[in-house]
Amino acid sequence: MKKFLVAIDQGTTSSRAILFSLSGKPIYTSQKEFTQYFPKDGWVEHNPNEIWSTVRKVLTDVIVKSKKLKGKILTIGITNQRETTILWDKKSGKHVYLSLIHI
């Protein structure tokens, strides 16, 4: 059975998952863009639900690909939007507003 690593890159314009061999060779990439909102000049916002949806989609894509290659994913690494802020409602678990990217 082949063994793989996965990197999830949740960036400011898209979510991407990359399937790597153990030697670090990229085997397969899935990428999905999401909507950018510009409420004011110089501001950028994202919908947290859309971010989560795109991450789930690209991760599912690489999992399916690894199974087609008769492989097993050993580990997952994650990178994200360092500067992004999301406020969550403690009781509902839902976001209060769109995520704030650049102000």
Q: Which residues fall in each region the model found?
A:
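Conserved small/polar residues in nucleotide/adenosyl-binding loops
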Residues: 101-103
